[in-house]
C-alpha cells in the first residue's frame, strides 16, 4: 500500500481495543503506515483493562474456590477456603499485565506508531492528539477508523461519585469487603458479577428490568440460570425499575417504582452502555450519533464519510470483543481493497461467563417455533458423562436443535462449566455448507473418551432417536 503524500499516515486508528487491534494488524500486514491513538496509558482498551479480561479472571478465581470447597477430595468439612474481592483482584491484575505486554508487542513488531492521548477531529482528515501535560499535536491520514469502544451508561439521577455506588468499571477499585451487594441490571455483566459475588459468599440482590434473565437466550438456558441463582441464594427481582438511589455513609438504599425498598453495603449499576464519542469532535466533520453515543455504518463499516470507519462497541450490536476484532479486520480489508468481500458470520457465538457458563450459537427453540421450522431436540446431561463425573462438573447440559428432515443443525445451546469452549465443536459443523452440516456427523465420528466433547455424540443419538 502506498502512502498518499499529502497525509502523514495511510490510516489513523482511534482506540487500541480488540477492534483497533484487528484493524491495525490487518493494515500493517499490507504495508500501510499506521498511527494508533490510545487515551489510556496502556494498550488493550476496555476489554483488557475493565471488561472482558478482568471479569473473566475474577470469575475463574471464584469458580476454582467453589470447586475446592465442594470437592470431597479436598474438603473434609472442617476447612473452607475463603477469599475477598480484593484478593482475587490481584489475580485479575496479573492477567491484565500479561495481556498488555503481549498486545504492546503486537504493535511494536508491526511498526505501528502509538500515541498516548485523547483524539479529536479538527477536520475530516486531521486529528488532534491531546496529551496529559496539556500539549497537543496534529496528525493527518487518508483514512480514519473510530474504535473508541463504550463505557457504562450513567443516568443523571445516580450519583456515581458516591463511594458506595459503582459501575462495571469502577467496581474493579472496590476497596472494602461488602457483605451484601445490590446489582441493578440483569444483563450479561450483571449476571456475571452476581455469580462472582455470590461465589465469594456475598449476599446478592439482582434487580432485573425485564421479565426474565437474558431474554435473548434460549428459554431453557435462561431458566437454568434463574434456577441456579435461586438455588445459590441470589434474590432476583424481575420487572423492576429504580425510582431513586440514596447513598449512605455505610451503604446504599434503592427505592423501586413498585414501592419496594432495598438496602445493601454497595450498589453495582450495570444497566446499559454508551459509545465513547462525546470527546471526538464529531460535529467538526458533520457526523452525529444516536442517543447512546453510537455511530451508524454500512456493511463495510463506513460512516456517512466514506473514508471514516467505525467498529466495535461504538456501533452497537453485537458488542462482543470477538466480533470487534473481526470488524477491524474487515474495515482494514475495505481500505486496502476498496471493498470488504468477507462479512461477519451470520451466527455469532455467545459466551456468558456466569458460574456455570452459558454459550449458544444459532437459533433458539422460540425462534424456530415462530418460524414454523420442523425441528427436533437432542440433549445430553453433563452428569451422564464420564469426564464430568471425574472432574466433578455434573451441573449442565448440551442441547442441539436440528431439522427433522434434512438433519441440518440449526442451533446449539450449552449450560455448564466450559460451555464457551464446548460450543465451538458444534459451531464448526454448523458452519459447513450443504450436506456438511448434519447432526449425523457426531454419531459417525469417534470422540476421545472420556471428554466433555462426547456430549455431542450423546445429544445426537438422543435427538435422532426421537425421529419416526
UniProtKB/Swiss-Prot annotation:
Q: Which SUPFAM superfamilies match?
A: FAD/NAD(P)-binding domain, FAD/NAD-linked reductases, dimerisation (C-terminal) domain
Gene Ontology, cellular component aspect: cytosol
The superkingdom listed in its UniProt entry is: Bacteria
* Essential cofactor(s): FAD
Q: What does the entry list as the binding residues for FAD?
A: 38-47
UniProt record, GO biological process: 2-oxoglutarate metabolic process; NADP metabolic process
Reactions catalysed? NAD(+) + NADPH = NADH + NADP(+)
**What InterPro entries would the database entry show?**
Class-I_Pyr_Nuc-Dis_Oxidored, FAD/NAD-bd_sf, FAD/NAD-binding_dom, FAD/NAD-linked_Rdtase_dimer_sf, Pyr_nuc-diS_OxRdtase, Pyr_nucl-diS_OxRdtase_dimer, STH_gammaproteobact
**Which keywords appear in this protein's UniProt record, sorted alphabetically?**
Cytoplasm, FAD, Flavoprotein, NAD, NADP, Oxidoreductase
Q: What does this protein do?
A: Conversion of NADPH, generated by peripheral catabolic pathways, to NADH, which can enter the respiratory chain for energy generation.
- What name does UniProt use for this protein? Soluble pyridine nucleotide transhydrogenase
Give me the gene this protein comes from: sthA
